[in-house]
Amino acid sequence: PKGGTPLHVIDANRVAYLDYTGSGNETARHAGGPMTLMVMSMSRSDAAVVRLYGTATVTPVEDSPLRELMLSEPAPDIALPQLQVIDVRIDGTQTSCGYGVPVYDFVAQRTVSERGRCYKEVLA
């Protein structure tokens, strides 16, 4: 799950987002293979789920042609280094009603962003 990170619509068949370091890097391990992004509404008045099916490329931030766009709108509440740009070429979409998604009132971003890294250091 990703939160607090803007999803940029590049064109009708392409989206991208800035990825940050964290407890793992599973997205990069599957670059070039199938990827599914799920976007959903948790508001009371607008239930919806959209799945974006495609193929991702993963590029270090400093080497990405989308670098300027990605850095123009970083996630202010994520206190982690920026890692890479995930660029997804969309091959298909699917929508569903979203009424199974709970209504959610946003309180705050989590502030314990280093927690996953602590486990990695113990296991290393």
Model-derived regions: residue spans:
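Binding-site signature for planar aromatic cofactors or substrates
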Residues: 1-124
